[in-house]
Design a protein with these regions (language model features):
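A short beta-sheet element
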Residues: 52-53, 71-135, 152-154
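Amphipathic alpha-helical coiled-coil/heptad-repeat segments
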Residues: 164-218
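Specificity-determining recognition surfaces
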Residues: 40-42, 49, 134-163
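Short, basic/aromatic beta-hairpin or loop at an interaction surface
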Residues: 55-68, 90
Length: 218
């Protein structure tokens, strides 16, 4: 394919027929949530899923320590109700920049002030997620943080992020390709983590057995 300069130094050359719009032009909503009145005191065991930055990872949502809010609070926070295909993007703290797509099957959900809802329009949600996870999205984030915005990413700054925009067909092809490849890599990583955990347990057991005399070394 014929490539031209993107006009953005750190992006470099891109296919000639791709566009580089600002994030604001391919989304219908960019905004973070808030903490309900009463903070953690209002969390309940069952109810509406309330997502925090520790639930948002690049490989998807992790709900092992998710908290819940009652439906009435969810209604009070209706402006930050999460919809299927929203991109959830961490905008503060050590996990800033992590993002994933909100998928079917979780049910009703809301977010706190550390998570930004990015609602795609005129762009494939999965492609946008990968774009934000890529060098393109993460470089812009680092540049903002270097510029003194160490506290986090503001909605206004986020709206001005550049994103890449191929044709809808190319977006789908790219998203499908990355879904397959990333899934395989994630599986390998998970397998290696289990092996590492087993070896660490083995090491700890060996040390314990030697220092307590259960294993003789002479």
């Amino acid at each position: 394919c014929i490539r031209d300069s993107s006009g953005v130094k750190w992006i470099g050359d891109i296919p000639r027929d791709w566009e580089i719009p600002r994030l604001n032009f391919v989304t219908s909503k960019i905004g973070s949530g808030s903490t309900p009145k009463g903070g953690s005191e209002v969390y309940v065991d069952e109810g509406v899923v309330f997502l925090r930055s520790q639930n948002v990872y690049n490989d998807g949502l992790r709900l092992n320590d998710v908290v819940h809010i009652v439906p009435s609070i969810h209604e009070q926070m209706k402006g930050t109700k999460v919809q299927v295909d929203d991109i959830l993007f961490n905008i503060t703290g050590a996990s800033i920049g992590r993002c994933c797509r909100f998928t079917k099957g979780i049910g009703e959900a809301n977010v706190n002030q550390h998570v930004c809802i990015v609602r795609p329009k005129n762009i494939l949600p999965t492609f946008l997620m990968y774009c934000l996870q890529s060098f393109v999205g993460q470089t812009q984030l680092r540049q903002l943080l270097k510029g003194g915005n160490r506290e986090g990413l503001s909605g206004e700054s986020f709206k001005n992020f550049y994103v890449l925009l191929p044709s809808p067909n190319e977006q789908q092809q790219i998203a499908t390709y990355l879904d397959i490849k990333c899934s395989k890599i994630d599986h390998i990583v998970a397998t290696q983590k289990k092996k590492i955990a087993y070896l660490q347990e083995l090491k700890q057991s060996l040390i314990t057995n030697v220092v307590t005399g259960k294993i003789k070394v002479s």
